[in-house]
Amino acid sequence: MATLQSLADLGQANKAALATADTEAPVHVQKLDAQGRAYATGKRKDAVARVWIKPGAGTITVNDRPVDTYFARPVLRMILQQPLHVANRVDQYDIVVTVTGGGLSGQAGAVRHGLARALTYYEPELRSPLKREGFLTRDPRVVERKKYGRKKARRSFQFSKR
């Protein structure tokens, strides 16, 4: 390690460190299986979604059923289609999803997480807009456990003063 004699030397050392940091940025490459599909998993609460995408007409199949029948509420369909809207890729990919565990809301969040990850595997340049919107980050919030001496996680038993 070189010794620094003045502030100018410190500035030069800092520029050299920044230059090496820029060149060592990870290069994301396309990850496809033998059938030309991108595969990713997504998680939310107790739900785990396995997502496969390939170029197509825009059909979304969840557990061998159309998305309109599996997620009957429009809000849930909107949640899982958010990555496609951010990436401007609506009706460009056929999506096949297998999702297990949790409730419908957690499953929709898991599908959204997996779909965003699969899109980045198919088109690595979409990583920055999807990351900016927070779709690539796994939501760490889970149900708090019940404690003994309490009715629920935080709710106490009813107290009678007399």
From Swiss-Prot:
GO MF term set: RNA binding; structural constituent of ribosome
PROSITE patterns reported in the protein's UniProt record: RIBOSOMAL_S9
Pfam families, sorted: Ribosomal_S9
GO cellular component labels: cytosolic small ribosomal subunit
Record-linked InterPro entries: Ribosomal_Su5_D2-typ_SF (IPR020568), Ribosomal_uS9 (IPR000754), Ribosomal_uS9_bac/plastid (IPR023035), Ribosomal_uS9_CS (IPR020574), Ribsml_uS5_D2-typ_fold_subgr (IPR014721)
Ribosomal protein is among the record's keywords: yes
Keywords: Ribonucleoprotein, Ribosomal protein
Keyword Ubl conjugation applies: no
A biological-process GO annotation: translation
Family named by the database record: Belongs to the universal ribosomal protein uS9 family.
Matches recorded under PANTHER family: RIBOSOMAL PROTEIN S9, SMALL RIBOSOMAL SUBUNIT PROTEIN US9M
Name the UniProt record assigns to this protein: Small ribosomal subunit protein uS9
